[in-house]
Amino acid sequence: MEALGVAQREEASVRILTEDALRTSAIEGETLDADQVRSSLARRMGLATAGLPPPSREVDGLVEMMLDATRQAGAALTEERLLGWHAALFPVGGSPLVRITSGAWRTAASGPMRVVSGAYGHERVHFEAPSHDRVAGEIRGFLDWFNAPLVVDPVIASALAHFWFVTIHPFEDGNGRVSRAIADLALARADRSDLRFYSMSAQIETERSAYYGMLERTQKGGTDITGWLVWFLGCLGRALDRGEKSVAAIIRKASTWERINAGIPVNERQRAVIHA
């Protein structure tokens, strides 16, 4: 990272955060407008927004959660903070077709939270989350552990937090996105930096089938979560490799512009290619 100047660090950060927002949504089958994501990020990071469209409330809420998780990583993770993230993700209470209660734990009204497959009447239940009346207690136990002094490696803590929260499944919707934000918060603590030059969500989306398969096998497999930990650490390693390549591309582009500014003539078409 030392090879990056201030402008290049900002470019790298916006690029990675944009990809993170797009991919954590894509994992759940949602497609966001990349320019709206960049617009929301730029505004919150004090960067120029000229030419960018105003973001939707949903995009703004996702970006708000992501930045709060990574840039306020040292702050305690509380019920109020989690509920605030959920309210930001669903500012109008879900979609017109599927309404949910925003900023609240699930209740009896939402019914059992199950992961199923198969035709109606012949469903196969892969996993069933704790019942609604256990959610508050499960969350308190999770937060007590998460905020206590670490007794495991912080990267392992990130993997544990991701799995634990998504297994509680405390919300009607958005559990995956919130669990990945919690994992990013734990990784930011491990990195001891609020700057992120890799995207775990981008790598998870690339390995989406393996991600869901490993979650299912681990949730059905009792108390041994070794397989999940091994997969998560491998995925993180691949995310770091991917991030390194992205940063290297930014460094190459910056070096090219330095040579151009030193007097090498280029036309508009060449400039457009360099900016791409």
Per-segment meaning from a language model:
Residues 1-276:
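FIC/Doc superfamily catalytic core
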